[in-house]
């Protein structure tokens, strides 16, 4: 914990993550004190149930041909089974699988578990959390084509947002024709780094060596090309900077490997991001 607070506390990504993780922080740290609260001090608040229910959001947005097996919502079924890359999660009420929020969300969920593992274990929520983060991780790996350990192609989005937003229905009822695929062999550095971060923290938490291998490869891909994703993004998740994502991923890769190269990347990209430098056109 101190590593990130000291090394990344000034970065905009960590500030955003701190806000996102606040519900986990509040819920888990308050749990030990709940039994001691007086009746006049909101004794009806149940932070354990809040944590449990908050994760149902991901079950509700699960996508692919394993929803019925992996998800905990009995009213959800398999969907979009003809996607070029199955799995993953829908974004925000629509059914697009956007890359930028997916990587950010998965890494933040992993961070919550990394910080408060004992609370998840005590509340019996570790298995559910792992199902969600593993589902993210498998999708990220399936989006990535490797050749001798090097990324040669990377899918960063499934679905055309404008087309998707013109159709309002349950995901199971949406036309299951193969949806538009957005991929690159030399870009989307912001999203590749986000996936790398999520895979690295999932390796730290649960020890799947394949997650770490893909995390390293995606990170090398990200810093090799240094271009943000543009095609298909529109104004939904438009990004002008990849340094914050690269710093965030470097921190987790350092914790996963103890390789000082990643610590150097962390400092370099964190400083670049804080100084407002951008690797692509725009402000």
Model-identified regions with their sequence ranges:
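Sec-dependent N-terminal signal peptides
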Residues: 10-28
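Sec-dependent signal peptide cleavage junction
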Residues: 25-43
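Short, surface-exposed loop/turn segments at secondary-structure junctions
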Residues: 45, 92, 118-130, 209, ...
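Long, well-ordered core segments of solenoidal/helical folds
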Residues: 54-66, 78-80, 132-148, 214-230, ...
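Active-site lining segments of carbohydrate-active enzymes
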Residues: 153-241, 247-255, 266-283
């Amino acid at each position: 914990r101190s590593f990130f607070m000291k090394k990344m506390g000034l970065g905009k990504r960590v500030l955003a993550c701190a806000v996102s993780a606040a519900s986990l922080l509040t819920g888990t740290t308050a749990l030990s004190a709940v039994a001691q609260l007086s009746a006049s001090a909101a004794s009806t608040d149940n932070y354990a149930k809040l944590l449990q229910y908050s994760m149902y959001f991901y079950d509700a947005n699960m996508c692919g041909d394993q929803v019925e097996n992996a998800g905990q919502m009995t009213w959800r079924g398999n969907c979009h089974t003809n996607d070029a890359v199955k799995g993953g999660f829908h974004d925000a009420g629509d059914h697009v699988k956007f890359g930028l929020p997916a990587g950010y969300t998965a890494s933040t969920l992993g961070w919550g578990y990394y910080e408060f593992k004992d609370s998840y274990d005590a509340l019996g929520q570790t298995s559910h959390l792992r199902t969600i983060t593993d589902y993210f991780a498998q999708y990220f790996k399936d989006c990535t084509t490797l050749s001798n350990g090097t990324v040669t192609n990377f899918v960063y989005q499934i679905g055309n947002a404008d087309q998707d937003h013109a159709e309002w229905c349950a995901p199971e009822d949406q036309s299951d024709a193969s949806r538009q695929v957005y991929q690159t062999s030399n870009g989307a550095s912001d999203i590749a780094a986000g996936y790398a971060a999520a895979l690295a923290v999932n390796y730290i938490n649960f020890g799947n060596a394949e997650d770490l291998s893909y995390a390293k490869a995606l990170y090398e891909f990200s810093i090799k090309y240094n271009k943000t994703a543009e095609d298909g993004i529109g104004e939904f998740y438009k990004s002008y900077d990849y340094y914050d994502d690269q710093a965030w991923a470097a921190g987790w890769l350092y914790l996963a490997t103890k390789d000082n190269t990643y610590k150097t990347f962390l400092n370099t990209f964190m400083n670049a991001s804080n100084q407002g430098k951008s690797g692509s056109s725009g402000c």
